[in-house]
Amino acid sequence: MLSLRPYEFWFVTGSQHLYGEEALKQVEEHSRIMVNEWNRDSVFPFPFVFKSVVTTPEEIRRVCLEANASEQCAGVVTWMHTFSPAKMWIGGLLELRKPLLHLHTQFNRDIPWDSIDMDFMNLNQSAHGDREYGFIGARMGVARKVVVGHWEDPEVRERLAKWMRTAVAFAESRNLKVARFGDNMREVAVTEGDKVGAQIQFGWSVNGYGIGDLVQYIRDVSEQKVNELLDEYEELYDIVPAGRQEGPVRESIREQARIELGLKAFLQDGNFTAFTTTFEDLHGMKQLPGLAVQRLMAEGYGFGGEGDWKTAALVRLMKVMADGKGTSFMEDYTYHFEPGNELILGAHMLEVCPTIAATRPRVEVHPLSIGGKEDPARLVFDGGEGAAVNASLIDLGHRFRLIVNEVDAVKPEHDMPKLPVARILWKPRPSLRDSAEAWILAGGAHHTCFSFAVTTEQLQDFAEMAGIECVVINEHTSVSSFKNELKWNEVFWRGR
C-alpha cells in the first residue's frame, strides 16, 4: 500500500477560570485519560494528541495557529468539559484551516445519583457548554463535524475513526498529484473539467505527460524484475494454462508486468498517487494497461479511464478513506431489467480493482476491440456482496458536485463465461428506475468510484471539508423531492 505521513489528531478541551484551579486540573486529568484510552483502541487509525485545556482567547487562537502550521496534524477535535464562553473561540475559529470535529460528550457516562452535588454539576457542564460552543460555530458558518455520545461508546469511536480517515484523505487531497497519460477520450463531456479550479478547490495538481515518457520507463525495466513479478502473479492469481508456458499468452502477461513496473516507477519518481490512461493515446505501447492498472489500484493508486482525472483523484481519496479496502474505479455498463430483480452490471474495459473481488482473480488474455493494440492481459473475477456506495464527482462550471448512490452488491445468479472482464452486480437504492432518474438529473458521470468500505457519511464529511455540494441517492430518495433539492442547491451555491 502507498504509505501516508504519520498523521495525528489534536484533542483540545475548552473551559474557563471561573471554577478555580482544582476544577481545571480535573478537566485536564479527564482529557488525558480519554486520549490515553482512545490510543489503546485499534479502531482508531491515527493517534490522538492531547494539546491543552484552553481557557482564554489567546490560548485558543494559539493552538489553532499551531494546528495550521503542523504537517502532522490532520484535524482538531474539540470538547467543552465545562462551560467555555464561546466569544473566546471566535479568533481561533477564524484562523483554523484544519478539519474540525466537535465531540459532544462528557467524562462520566452516568449521573451519580447518590452523590451528585453542585461541585459535580459545575465540573460536568458539557450538556450546555457544548451548546454554547455549537452556537458560535453556527453563527460563524464554521464547517465542522458534530458527534454526540459517550466517549467510550463503540459507535461514537467508530464515527470518530471514519472521520479521521476522511480528514486524512482531505490532507492528502491538498498535495495530490495526478499524471495524465494522453488526453481525454475525444468528444466526451463529463471527463472534462477545470483543472485550475480543481487545484484551487481541492489542491490537486493535474498535468499531462506524453506516452513516450512512459514508454521509456517501460523499456528500462529489466527482465529480472519482470520475471520476479511473474512469479508474484502465479502466487496470487489463477493463470490460464496457456499463460503458464512460453507462447503469445505468456508474452502478453509479461508485457503487462513490464507496463506495471514502468508505470509504477514513473509515478514514484514524480510523487503521483493517481493517474489516467486512454485507449486513443497509446503510441509506442504494445497494449492498453489492464492488469498493470488493476494491481496499482490495489496498492492504493487512484485511476480513471479515458483521461478521467476527476475520478482518478476521487478513487485515490476514497482508497485513503477505506484504508485501501474494497474500493475501485467503476462504470455503470449495462442493465438487467427483469421485473422485481432490476440490476446494474458494473465493469470497465479492463480496469476494475481486485480489492472488490469475491473470487480468486484469474489472469486471462483476450482481444480488445478498441485501441488497435495487442491483446491485453487482465484480471477477471466476480465482485463481492454487500452494502456499498457509488460516487461521482462532476464539474458544473461554477462548482463541483459530488453525487453518491447507496447500492447493494449481489452475487450473480448466472455464470458469464464469455465476459472477459472483472465485473460486479448491484441493486441501486431506492430502485434502478428512481436511482438512475435522480443520477441523470444530477448530472452523474458514467465513471464512478465503487466502495464497500467508504460510507455516505464519510463522503458527506469530505464534501463539507472541501466546500463542495454533495447529493445522496438512497432508500429515502423520491425523484420529486430530489428535483427540488437540486433547485435549492443551485440557488444556495450560486449565492455563495
UniProtKB/Swiss-Prot annotation:
Entry's cofactor comment: Binds 1 Mn(2+) ion per subunit.
Name this polypeptide is given: L-arabinose isomerase
GO annotation (BP), single: L-arabinose catabolic process to xylulose 5-phosphate
Cofactor: Mn(2+)
Pathway(s) it belongs to: Carbohydrate degradation; L-arabinose degradation via L-ribulose; D-xylulose 5-phosphate from L-arabinose (bacterial route): step 1/3
Species annotation: Geobacillus kaustophilus (strain HTA426)
Binding site residues for Mn(2+): 306, 331, 348, 447
Enzyme Commission number(s) from the entry: 5.3.1.4
Lineage of source species: Bacteria, Bacillati, Bacillota, Bacilli, Bacillales
InterPro entries documented for this protein: Ara_Isoase_C, AraA_central, AraA_N, AraA_N_sf, Fuc/Ara_isomerase_C, Fucose_isomerase_N/cen_sf, Lara_isomerase
Pfam families attached to this UniProt entry: AraA_central (PF24856), AraA_N (PF02610), Arabinose_Iso_C (PF11762)
Enzyme class: isomerase
GO cellular component, one term: cytosol
CDD domains with a match to the protein in the record: L-arabinose_isomerase
GO molecular function, one term: manganese ion binding
